[in-house]
Amino acid sequence: MREPAFTVGIEEEYLLVDRQSRALAADPPEALMTRLAAAFGDTNHGAVTPEFLRAQIEVGTKVCDSLAEAGEALGALRRVLAEEAKGFGLAPIAASTHPFAEWADLKHTPKERYDLLAEDLQAVVRRLVICGMHVHVGIEDPDLRMDLMAQVSYFLPHLLALTTSSPFWRGEDSGLKSYRIAVFSALPRTGLPDSFSSFAEYQRHVEVLVSAGLIEDSTRIWWDIRPSHRFPTLEMRIADVCTRLDDALCVAALFRCLLRMLYRLRRANQRWRHYARLLIAENRWRAQRYGLDGGLVDFGRGEVVPFADLIEELLELIAPDAAVFGCQAEVLHARTILHRGTSAHNQLRVFAEARAGGMTRDEALVAVVDHLIAQTVAPLGADAGAPGP
């Protein structure tokens, strides 16, 4: 079997905020998308598209052969978006929830696909004021894609824990590091994927839903990981959007290296042990609730293991693959995330410090938005503040 290309592409969703009020821009001007289309058309880094809510926007990098190339593209997309939005009094924030937005105040983008979603899913989709990061890795063989999807699902909670950026919901500390997952889970066809023996079996299951008129195609299957409908890729979708660019590249590198590690096992007639969805879902919940703080269950040992220990084990597993891809620095950045916390940790820290400094609750929430605006466009290696966990 020929080794997959393992190309990489990254999609990120952002929220647009008003620079004066720091509230979500419920109805940004149409001219912004026109300007962005022109600005992005002048680069070869990727594309920008509207999202379900008018207050959201999505960027996607071009297909990249390395994490360095992906980082250059994603950094450029963030900068161009921020520069163009500033001309309209707006700013993007790479956070999976807004600290104090009210979903009932927002409008969805007038587009046939989104109109159908709004009609079908009603209040469930109107509450979807959330953003995620999707990482595509090129795996040309469709059956291999399905096999690796089943195996890498074990590691999805690890990736979620490293990306959490949604601790607040409607002005309150949700108590979860990723409240986005709680909101998104209200949609049908979400969560951990089923396992399939082949791509043909997967297609047969999808066709049942399509033939019954329930979905248009497999883009309406919103699992934490899925075979892409448009590209010969495996698409990781569990992640919150990372506020910091270096965190996003770390998680993309980890996902890519994990897939190659599992491919190496397959070439040696080995594979990662299959665990029931019940067990992986427990780790998914722990990542959603605690992020880096609570540890995950090692099912072989039958006990909760500190997340720092799990990351060291993971880094050892993928070391040969990081060397092949030349992304050692990106994967080792996981240790930095452990030290200073994810975006969720840092948002909570900024809020606590603002309150301790005498700010009102509303003022402290605005301070969190200011932190997110700055960190979204922070260059690689810039200081993120005090340690979080």
From Swiss-Prot:
It catalyses: L-cysteine + L-glutamate + ATP = gamma-L-glutamyl-L-cysteine + ADP + phosphate + H(+). Its EC number is 6.3.2.2. GO terms for biological process: modified amino acid biosynthetic process. The keyword Nucleus does not apply. The keyword Secreted does not apply. GO terms for molecular function: ATP binding; glutamate-cysteine ligase activity. Keywords: ATP-binding, Ligase, Nucleotide-binding. It comes from the Bacteria. PANTHER family: GLUTAMATE--CYSTEINE LIGASE 2-RELATED (PTHR36510:SF1). Belongs to the glutamate--cysteine ligase type 2 family. YbdK subfamily. ATP-dependent carboxylate-amine ligase which exhibits weak glutamate--cysteine ligase activity. NCBIfam families: gshA_cyan_rel, PRK13515.1. This is Putative glutamate--cysteine ligase 2. It comes from Rhodospirillum rubrum (strain ATCC 11170 / ATH 1.1.1 / DSM 467 / LMG 4362 / NCIMB 8255 / S1). The lineage of its organism: Bacteria, Pseudomonadati, Pseudomonadota, Alphaproteobacteria, Rhodospirillales.
